[in-house]
Amino acid sequence: MKRPLLFFLMLAISIYSRAGDRLSALPYPILGGELSNSATTSVEDIDEVMPRMKALGLNTVLVPAYWELMEPVEGQFDFTLIDRTIDVARQEQLHVIFLWFGVWKNSMSCYAPGWFKQDTKRFPRAATAEGKPMEIASCFSDNVLQADLKAFSALMKHIKERDPQREVVIMMQIENEIGMLESARDHSPLAEKAYQKERWAERYGTDDYADEQFMALYYARYVEHLAKAARQIHDMPLYVNAAMNSRGRRPGEYPSAGPLAHLIDFWHEGAPSIDLLAPDIYDTGFKSWAAQYAMPQRPQDGGKVKNRLFIPESRCCENSGVRALYAFGEHQALGFSPFAIDQASSAETSSVTKAYALLRQIFNYQSSIFNSKTWGLLFDQEDKERVIDDNGVVMTCRHFFTLPWDPRATDGSVWPEGGAMLIRLGKYDYLLAGSGVVVDFKTPTEKQQEQQKLLGEDGFAEAGNTPGQSSKAGKRFHGKRLGLLSVDEVKVDSEGKLKYLRRHNGDQSHQGRHARISVGDWKLLHIRLYEYE
């Protein structure tokens, strides 16, 4: 089947340049949390929930803006909830990202006002291939667009009046998890007219993925109208979020045609005013999903970053903290935000609070931290090890439970994820921030001659022929080695300087063999190396 990708590959360099300027103007990396859908539907709820978000260590709260409550009568706007959110956030010294629950929320038009929902002739619905009308307004209807555009523009104007310097509201999400369900594309009369006009089937084929590409382009063009209007009213970063195409589903089984990684060129072509496409990550494979949205510089984009990673929704769980550290370390993420953090248990939010406390210190220590070389580590029971070669320093990074000393490592327990942000400060000089990881450091020649030995719980090699022992055993060692000069637990003080807390040596470094942070501990380690032979 023909693919229309070549048509979309060469996008205007200026689009990425302007987006980069807007994103670089954000006050800091976003240590966020998204509120549950109904958390701010009254001023009493807002007054209660926002201080709790501050106490959890967030610097930014992602808050729904509900069309049905903002325009209950057509043409009559009520900004009470918006105003209260801005006022309380300002009082709590929090930033806000408003989520426009307009025509679409999780594909459906459930947050459209009653007057919109009931007038299906004026505001037509999308239809499946079998002609079944969906509770999804059709993006091919100009009436739908104009109603949505009018309300969103009114919201942007009001935000500009209340917060003209962007002291509180720093970014806007347009719609929420756009996508067609049950069919790969809309088959309503208006959609069919556009489909025939494009001669899409003739040019690109008729399978589900060709249909999805058609739908993605039209969803993006729809969003562009809102983004362009917003940009003219109050210029700030704008993004759209996506429900992932996971679990082997086909378009329509997952929300088809949303801002998915495999459709990014269609979305960039149709909605050039959008700064970010953002993944909502709930399924397994966190690292893989994140990597699809961290799109580095490419020659065809004029050397500009194609898409910065921002995760506006992720399952709030006991692994959230190490996932945040991974996202910032590996991909220099713009931000991270667990979903429904207001409803999460203390066990689930604890990891977020502790990880964010470490990240605040790191960003305070070196505001331009992403000018340094950084890595993200994230391990579980299946994915236990990563080897990094940093210009002659080979770092073997592993899950803490690869050491035999904790009984949970071998008693059949499910391992919690371990993860960290690893930062090169200079030659033989590193910071490690995280939980549940162990890192050793070797020269390349030392690593090549390494003898793999299983350790007993006393830290010494098991007796006899250890499984996996290198065939190089008995050969004379040659070359230089790296040793730990010091491993210090530190914190960053109010002046942005490293402050010594304690030395990790002896048993805490396995007599100089590695740096480690136990599962359940959250630490910032300053590691210095030296070379010897």
PLM feature segments, named:
Residues H225-D235, H262-K373:
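Catalytic-core region of carbohydrate-active enzymes that cleave or remodel glycosidic bonds
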